[in-house]
Structures are given as structure tokens and as C-alpha cells.
């Protein structure tokens, strides 16, 4: 290996390397910019034509595309020159049995390499070989199909394989300048998403039709666009933190500018649960007897409110206990009786409320059944014995305080060993709510707000009235020192003794040099 082999290696890309190896502008290659337009395509839409017409120069267009262009621009789309619609010539292409364009005389199929011409007077299209042999060389200038006379100048070249400049799409005037004709019907159709679905099967179309019928996206969007209603903040529901709108408007230009801090409003349920201090009591009337339940409303307020509200709306009336396991639990609260149904009072599952001082210890513990974390609805179960392993899995919200003999009778009913369903129906006929702490909490909150409304005007009146002695000090003149009494300053000056007459001046002792050490 030679020395200094990496001496010319750079830690950066040089200009020459970037130009030749890693990027940079490449030299233009004219042949790569050539885009060939087939002879059977419209020079404006660049799509196969249906009603072909041509200009005196032999540029082919589709009648449905060129007419709107001429109405708007009045120019030739390929070169930008003025063009009159009356100068367009209708072309009559012939097709063979396979549906391909061909010469009606020689029956040669037209390709992109065929020399194609048309007669101006009739619009018939032929291969150049047929016109050259039968018209030009024979000096018989009559149409080969209709026998109509024409001149040498009436022969229009539509395609010459040796001169393809007019078929170069890259040189078209409307392509270079990005000029288009906007069809109102097409623009309206583009607003429908199905416009962009070209190939769909029957199943997809049926699914889309069903989606369009049930789609409520516009309603949801309109609901989200509405400004949320501001909660009324008072002394009871005012949080110790602000809404954060001031800082948000300061850091984001998308927010509406805010300059005043507003206290955030505490959720109404959180406020109500602070006033719930009592237990709730409910009785279940079953076909086996009555069960008296005590609800821990002060510990699990959300779960207990759900149970009490469902009992008050008679949600559990007529439901059965669909699952019973001896020495374990009995479960109910499902209107369908299958163990998979039921809804909460609010129509959606709510969160678990685990408390360390509540455990599945003992007989008659009332707890919520669920299908996983935070999936509580309406189903509940009552334990027949201690089940401590269910702690922190199911929310305990009450216990049985009366009717243990009824609970024993329920346990003695035999169940199907495969499905755990009682062979004899155990049904809840009705429910009775004796104590509802939430009504008392609502009444207490309403009373607190009434007293606040009464106290607020009185405090405003007191604050508006000036208090005794709260007036400003007396002014004696304008400007600096306007509160100073001139008489007080004069009296103080007269009573002040003269220091020059009473205090004697102390005499300085002359210094006598070093002296001796007697004073040391």
C-alpha cells in the first residue's frame, strides 16, 4: 500500500462530485422531452377522439373538445394561432371488422407509422399510397369513394412519419401554458367522492350506498364547529386553576386572544359528590322474598348513583338472576337475561371506583359485574361467601343488611353445571329506594346558590358606600406638599430654640508635639 493514499479525500462533497456523481443539473436531452401523440387522439384532450375534425394544417381534434375551447379562447390549442370554427373539416375515418381504422381503398390498417391524408372537400381519410397511385400519378383528382372532384391543394396531410413535430405533446401551446377548459358539469361531479372510483364491484357499490344513507359526518362536523357553551362559574364550582386560555392565546396564533384569567369550572358530578355524606338504602322485591341493601354512596358515589337511578326508573323490574354459583355469587341486572346486555344510566360504561377499605369479605357483598377495567354498566352480583381475590377487579358499592334467609333460598336453587343458569327462575319483581343521598345533595347545592345570590347584592351595596373616615386627607394648596398645613410648620419654627446662643463652642487644645509617656 502506498503512502498518503487518502491525502486527497475530502470530508465534504466537492462541486465536481456533486455535479457529475451525486446530483446537480443534468444537460437537457431533446429526445427525452419528446412525447408522441397517437394519430387517433385529440390534440386538445390527448384522449381518443369520437367525432374527429381537423384544421387546414392537418391537426386533429375532437369536436366536443374544440368547440368550448374556441368559444373561450378562439385560438389553435397546439400553436396558439387564431382559429375560426368554420375552417374545421369533418373527417370520415373507416373501420374494419375488428374496429380498427384502415384505408377504405387499400384496406391497410393505420398505425403511428402510416402516412395518412384526407380530402378537404369530402373529409374522407385514405392512406397516402392510395391517393398517390390513383389520383396524383393518374392525374385523376376525384374522390375515390364519392367521385367528387378536388384539387391538389385539397389534400391534407394528417400524419407524416418523416415529420412528427405536430404530434409532440411537449410543444403544444396549451400544455406549455397549462390552459384548460373547466366543464361545470364535471366540476360538480368531482364534488362527489364516487367520481374518482373508476372500477367498483356490486358489493362495493351497495356498501357505499348504505354508507351515504347512514352517514352523519356533516351533522357531527357542524356540532363540533359550534362554540362550546361556557359553564357558569360560581363560588361552589370554581376551581383553583384557570381555563388556560390566556396562555394558549399567547403561544398560539390560532386561538382567540384572551387577556383575563377565568377560573375553570369543576365538573358538576364532582361538585355533587362532595355533598354526598350518607348511605343509600334500597329494597329488592324478588319472587323469593325481599333483600335490603345498604349502598356506600359516600365511598363510591358514581356507582351508587347509577344503581339508584336505574332502580328509580324501574330498569331492574322483571329482570332475572341469570347466573348463580353456590358458595360463590349470584349475578343479575341484565334485561336480556343473557349476561351480555345492560346499559348504565348514562348510556355508556363508567370507570371503576376501588377503595382500600372495601373488600369482598363476608356474605352479602354487593359488587358490580364487568367485562374488563372501566366497563361497568347495569349488571351486579351478591356474594355467598368471601371472595377477596375479586378486590380491585370489581367495584364494591354496597352490602346486604336484611333478608339473609332470602339470600340462602336463592343459593339453594340448583343451577345448570354447564351454564350456571338457575333451573328455577329467580326474578326481581320491583325495587324501592328508601334513602337517596343525591337528592339531598342537589337540594343542598341549590340552597347554597340561593344564599349566594342573596348575599351578593348586599356586598355590592356595602362596597359601593364610602366607609366612615375613608375620605381623603384635607388639602391646603395645589402641587407638591398640598397636604402639609402651613400654620403647623410656622409654629414649629418659632418654638425651635436657637442653637447658636445656647450651645457654647468647644475650644480645640493646641498640639504640643510628641510629649512624654505619662498619659500611657
Curated annotation (Swiss-Prot):
The modification Phosphoserine is found at residue 470. Highest expression in thymus, pancreas and testis. Also detected in heart, placenta, lung, liver, skeletal muscle, kidney, spleen, prostate, ovary, small intestine and colon. Poorly detected in brain and leukocytes. Strong protein expression in lymph node (cortical, paracortical and medullar regions), thyroid (follicular epithelial cells), testis (developing spermatozoa), stomach (cells lining the gastric pit), pancreas, kidney (proximal and distal-tubule cells and collecting duct cells but not in glomeruli), endometrium and colon (goblet cells). GO terms for cellular component: catalytic step 2 spliceosome; cytoplasm; Golgi lumen; nucleoplasm; nucleus; plasma membrane. It comes from Homo sapiens. Residues 456-520 are annotated as: Disordered. Pathway: Protein modification; protein ubiquitination. Residues 463-474 have a biased composition (Low complexity). The keyword Transferase applies. This is RING-type E3 ubiquitin-protein ligase PPIL2. Component of the minor spliceosome, which splices U12-type introns. Within this complex, interacts with PRPF8/PRP8, EFTUD2/SNU114 and PLRG1. Interacts with isoform 2 of BSG. Interacts (via the PPIase cyclophilin-type domain) with CRNKL1; they may form a trimeric complex with HSP90. GO terms for molecular function: ubiquitin protein ligase activity; ubiquitin-ubiquitin ligase activity.
